[in-house]
Amino acid sequence: MNWVEKYRPKTMSEIVGNNKIKEELKNWIEEILHNEIPKPVLLVGPPGCGKTTLTNALANDYGFELIELNASDKRNKDIIRQIVGGASSSKSITGKRVLIVLDEVDGLSGNSDRGGVSEIIKIIKNAKNPIILTANDIYKPSLMSLRTVCNIVKIGSVHTNSIVPVLRRISLKEGFEVDDKILKIIAKHAGGDVRSAINDLESLAMGNTFDEDNVRELPDRDTDKSIFDAIRIIFKTTHYDISLEATRDLKEDIGTVQEWIAENVPREYKKGKEICLAYDNLSKADIFLGRVYKRQYYGLWRYASALMSAGVSLAKDEKYRGFFSYMRPTIFTKMSRSKGKRGAVNKVLEKISLKSHVSKRRAREDILYLEYILKNDAEMGAKLCEFYEFTKEDIEYLTNKTIAKKIIKLMKGDDKKTNNKKGKENKTKNTTKKIKEIKETPKKEEVKEPKKQIEKQKSEKKEPKKQMTLESFF
């Protein structure tokens, strides 16, 4: 069981925050128990703020049986009259009072929901059982007439500080000790959506990647909300047109939507033949996408879209009731975790490509042989690493820290020998150069002095020097 469903609050007392709203709903339901008929409640708030959880907990606390009609169902005039009309004034088979929930009434639009709003208003006027409507956007034009006949209760986003304790409690129960700093980042990233925060926590726990870098790589939450709503409709509905419409307005590329659906098929469908048929339609959608890119003919796009949405919706025999937590594709998490590794291999390939004068694609073919040499012949590996100018990080990526240390040591030893050899060569060269300079220097010619001057110098040498005495000064 997914964590959102596993740890979903069953009673009002278990729900975090929104104390004022909980009290308001309790007072409203108690009025009904005292045979008063107050206006229906229109719960308005962003996805994940707890609208569904509040209605379920309220029904559990007061022993009401829930009858739900949500966005994955056709909700035109006839269907609403058939399902909701009778339930609005009678008890269930078990004799319990009935609580009717019309989910996401702001999504009532198009031909499939024609006349739905007007029929809801008619039922509200004659209802004897409590009715709760939920919506994400109260200001949609389609809700103008509903706003006048309902008691509007606005639910805000849950504060980050209220989400952190929930995440801490779940992680401890699942046997994970996660730092509060990480939990706060997850909670803050969820933007007040408790359901999304729990989904992110479960996704990170599956890969055991509770480090700050991976947490910050989580996708934008606004994007998740739109995809989450779309795939929920695809998995819940059994109508071709509703399923096809669910993906029509998504901003995400079709490949991303396909990954989301593929990831969550086994979470929703339980029968082997349903899972098999759903994946078969997804694989056919993938073939059409391949043809789109190969032939640049985008007319095939609609077939891929129909197969991955309606094809998956119609793969089941019947609709699965209950709420399922849909997970973001694990491939996104794996890509995030391998980001550093992919960067490292790219650097290595660039260096091999540059030195060997080949493409990176061709260099990739040789990388396995290079790894083998480095792991089994350290001396040869050291020479290759010097040639390719690999850094410590490059060598560690290709081998491991122990082998990398050995190779780096050999590389340093070779550098020392090379430096000593170069030093000796330079010394020899300098000596040779000096000798050569001496040999090539021309001798200075002696200047011949006149004979008389020479004789005079000789006579001066022969005469004894006079001894200096005290008398010589007088």
Swiss-Prot record:
Keywords: ATP-binding, DNA replication, Nucleotide-binding. It comes from the Archaea. SUPFAM superfamilies: P-loop containing nucleoside triphosphate hydrolases (SSF52540). Signal peptide: none annotated. Transmembrane segments: none annotated. Residues 415-474 are annotated as: Disordered. ATP binds at residues 45-52. GO terms for molecular function: ATP binding; ATP hydrolysis activity; DNA clamp loader activity. PANTHER family: CHROMOSOME TRANSMISSION FIDELITY FACTOR 18 (PTHR23389), REPLICATION FACTOR C SUBUNIT 1 (PTHR23389:SF6). Part of the RFC clamp loader complex which loads the PCNA sliding clamp onto DNA. Belongs to the activator 1 small subunits family. RfcL subfamily. HAMAP family: RfcL. This is Replication factor C large subunit. It comes from Methanococcus aeolicus (strain ATCC BAA-1280 / DSM 17508 / OCM 812 / Nankai-3).
